[in-house]
Amino acid sequence: MIKCVNCGAESAGKYCPGCGQEVAPKRMTVRLVFKDSTHKLLHLENPSINTIRQLIMWPGRTAKNYITGARKSLIKPYKFFLSWQTFHVLIFHWLSKNYFSYTNSVNQNNPDDKKELILMQQLIDQNIKYFDYLIPLFFAFFFYLFYRKKTGINFAESLSVSFYWISITLIISIIFMFLSLMYVKLWAVPIVFNIIFLTFASMRFSGSMKLSGAIKGLTAVILSYAVYLTLAVTLILAYVNNFHK
């Protein structure tokens, strides 16, 4: 019998029956430190990686599993969204100057218009953390509006679904932000992939994989982005026109 160095319980096995720690832990080495620090991060059973994998491969089924109670292997929707939204904001602040510089260089407007454009870009950069929260709310609303009768979903459940799926669109956007370092025009490409993903996810969730299902899903997605962009642009223009004349 070996006495556990952590809780003092005795065990004949490899792990302590009281606290679960190794009864005879190995001495620390550089290799062991690296293995311990990367195992949970890179292992497929890591909750974050597992949630991403499931949402990409089975977006409808995964979201439906969560709202029906099968949640053990998944990160909570808001926590998942908050993590990727924070990462998205950091990467946006870091890389947006490259894209804004490009758009300014090809813009042929007069100096006053160019000055206004630069101000709008600064406002977007400063407030992207707030704008990121608008699209999940609008998508949740339209998803609930379009699918509540067919699926029986309520708004809280729709919001959970939205946080999951919008998180995947943020991941797609982050990937293209990095790719834009090689070809700057790729910065604007994610919107296409995001619309396709959200439409497909909506179809899978509702079980409607026919043309009518695609049209319904696409309509909900387009309306979400349209309202989001309209509100965002209106707020920015109102600020520019009223405070920076």
Model-derived features with residue positions:
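Membrane-proximal intrinsically disordered regions of secretory-pathway and membrane-system proteins
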Residues: M1-K245
